[in-house]
Amino acid sequence: MHGSTGFVQGTRPAGDQADPLPVVRVSSESMTRYALYFTPVDDSPWAQAGSSWLGRHPASPEPVQQVNIPGIPRILLSSLTADARRYGFHATLKAPFRLFEGFNEEHLLQMARAFCAAQKAIVLDEVRVRPLMDFLALQVNGPLDEIGGLAMRCVTYFDLLRAPLTEPELAKRRRAGLNARQSALLQRWGYPYTEEFYRFHMTLTDALMHADADVIFTIRKAAEQHFAAAVAAVPLAIDALTIAREEYPGAPFVEWQRIPFSGQGERASLPHSGRIFFCVGPSGVGKDSLLNWVREHSAGDEKLVFAQRTITRATQANEAHEAVDTASFWRLAAGGQFAMVWQANDLCYGIRRGIEADLKAGRDVVINGSRAYVPQLLQAFPDAIVIWIDASENLLRERLEARQREQGPALLKRLKRAKEFAPSEQAQVIRLDNSGALEAGGQKLLDILRQAK
């Protein structure tokens, strides 16, 4: 299943000679939080009404003129909508979260684009101002199953990117008087009001438990009147996903990206996952040359990604891996930065976790891998395709000598290792003979990648 790494946090892979490292607690370095919202399109009556009601447009941190309610002092209305204003006029689909180590905004954005391409707009029934617990919100009568399905797809699909809540964050949530089921949801999804507890709503006030009944009545009637024009003008439809950003604790959540839904299927769904193409073969077989040829001849294919390796060796000519020293490599590994880790030829190799987001977004990932790692790969990623590249022993020696990277005992060691692994007979292992010209081998590899789609 995509998302598993085949590497236990805090230990080296099985078969390594070194002692295990201690388990390291992982936390997000960034203070930025992201939330997945529905927000009405900018110039719609709904967006205009929501912005003037709360006193802030979702796309800007700056306040705007707030609506005037006769009988309610402006300072009182401002204080009773302060938290709602900070979060902006929206409906939550996935509650705020920090990005987990190894993921960045580009991963979030590419997953969001893939997600939205598989979603269809949902027209909401009977949008009304109603009390929800101790605050006021716009709520709807339906279609509840479709809305709940969309929210749950958001919660599950993007959870790969979510950093776990810290102990203080968990404790703060638990103080809200959660029941056992809500506590379990908090632990699982980072938010207690998911699954059967999810209620689609667009918050209009903060908690009103300490406000006078007359004040609450006046604000509710004003809200009903304020949104009546939008209700009459155009139906409200969940037609896009908004990514909102909180730059630092307490800052306003500001709209960063709004991505329209564009699903063409009969029903909304999750994006189809991409596949891993794990290219292996002995030293000198020409993997790097083949992969470079394919990369050049597939330029512009946004659905094909060539994973960068992290290696404990300095980069040389025509190489593009991330070079780190051994201590840094194992710190990254213990911190959960890698989806794959292996060792070969006295070097450490890692593939960063960003490939998991690529796969979720439906992109195929090509990896320059290791034959020894194939069993672990297929355990962690059962759908992976292994491309086993081979050539004659004499040709391997010629190519190793020509590249002049290893000499003497190091060269002999690589030649000896070339004989230590035999291709697996599993169905997802594809043999590729690279004994001929580069163009011929490269075209074979490119055909494999294209035919597998």
From Swiss-Prot:
Region described as unknown: spans on this chain: 1-271
NCBIfam families, A to Z: phosphon_PhnN (TIGR02322)
Region (Ribose 1,5-bisphosphokinase): 272-453
InterPro entries given in the database record: DUF1045, GK/Ca_channel_bsu, P-loop_NTPase, PhnN
Name of the protein in its database record: Ribose 1,5-bisphosphate phosphokinase PhnN
Catalytic reaction(s) noted: alpha-D-ribose 1,5-bisphosphate + ATP = 5-phospho-alpha-D-ribose 1-diphosphate + ADP
Protein EC: 2.7.4.23
BP terms from Gene Ontology: 5-phosphoribose 1-diphosphate biosynthetic process; organic phosphonate metabolic process
Family indicated by similarity: In the C-terminal section; belongs to the ribose 1,5-bisphosphokinase family.
